[in-house]
Swiss-Prot record:
Protein's name according to its UniProt entry: Cytochrome b6-f complex subunit 4
Sequence intervals crossing the membrane: 36-56, 95-115, 131-151
Provenance organism: Tetradesmus obliquus
Record's bilayer topology term: Multi-pass membrane protein
Gene3D superfamilies referenced in this protein's UniProt entry, alphabetically: plastocyanin oxidoreductase, Single helix bin
Length: 160
């Protein structure tokens, strides 16, 4: 039993494209042995070379020794928690901040149900999901940058 779609070689449009060398490859390329024996080792070795090269060219800096009696003025979380930190910092009600954080995965779960009529996988043909992704990314970057600024200018970046 085959799961790949066989081409209709009687189709005149496909014949014309195949004559020009522009036909679509309906059969695909098998993962064994092409990917597993040839492409994956190249990617793994390339990643390993990048990690080794970057560690040699830019080693980790050894900072000043830790002093448990000198607390910094503001302790910032890791960079990937900046948007959440900014959200909790600027929302006056902490319960509202937690509910806003819970609204993000809840909103992402509802996207397939909102756009269930659309059968396309192309992002240009799925405007709701694409718009939600772009707006969410921009808001996360905006909140992340604002988390590193003082709270007075964190939402406007000091522009207004």
């Amino acid at each position: 039993m085959s799961v790949t779609k066989k081409p209709d070689l009687t189709d005149p449009v496909l014949k014309e494209k195949l004559a020009k060398g522009m036909g679509h490859n309906y059969y695909g390329e098998p993962a064994w042995p092409n990917d597993l024996l040839y492409i994956f080792p190249v990617v793994i070795l390339g990643t390993f070379a990048c990690v080794i090269g970057l560690s040699v060219l830019d080693p980790a800096a050894i900072g000043e020794p830790a002093n448990p009696f000198a607390t910094p003025l503001e302790i910032l979380p890791e960079w990937y928690f900046y948007p959440v930190f900014q959200l909790l910092r600027t929302v006056p009600n902490k319960l509202l901040g937690v509910l806003l954080m819970a609204a993000v995965p809840a909103g992402l779960i509802t996207v397939p149900f909102i756009e269930n009529i659309n059968k396309f996988q192309n992002p240009y043909r799925r405007p709701i999901a694409t718009t939600l992704f772009l707006v969410g990314t921009l808001v996360a970057v905006w909140l992340g940058i604002g988390a590193t600024l003082p709270i007075e200018i964190s939402l406007t970046f000091g522009l207004f």
